[in-house]
Amino acid sequence: STTAEQRKVLAGKQLFDSACMACHSIKAGEHGIGPSLFGVIGRMAGSAPGYAYSDAMRNAGVTWITENMVKHLMDTRGFIPGNRMGSMFKGVSTSNDGDSIAAYLATLK
C-alpha cells in the first residue's frame, strides 16, 4: 500500500503537471520560460547554471528548503519581491498544495 508520503508526492506531481510544467522542466539543464527544477530542493535561489535569472532571484539569499518553496508557491510576488514568476503565476491556494509540490520536487535528483 502507498504511504502518506507517497500520496503527497503523487499529488505534488499532479499539481506540478497542471500548474508548473508549462514553464518549468524537470530535466537537468533544460530550461523553459522558468528554470529547470531538477535538484531544486536544497539549492540556492537563482543558481541553476545556464538560466538568466532576475536580479531579485539571484540576490534573494534564499535556499530552496521545503518551507521556503511553500512560502514562494503561496505568495509568488511577495516572498521574493521583484521576481519574474510573480507576474505570471499567482501561486497555489493552500499550503498543503505547496507542500505536496515541494515533496515532489524533492524527488527530482
Model-derived features: where do they sit?
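Hydrophobic aliphatic residues
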Residues: 41-45, 73, 105
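Axial heme c-ligation environment in periplasmic c-type cytochrome domains
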Residues: 35, 50-98
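Detector for the c-type heme attachment site
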Residues: 24-29, 42
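Electrostatic cytochrome c docking/interface patches
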Residues: 1-15
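Short cysteine/histidine-rich zinc-coordinating motifs and their immediately flanking basic loops
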Residues: 32-38
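Extracytoplasmic/periplasmic, Sec-exported soluble proteins
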Residues: 4-8, 29, 60-61, 93
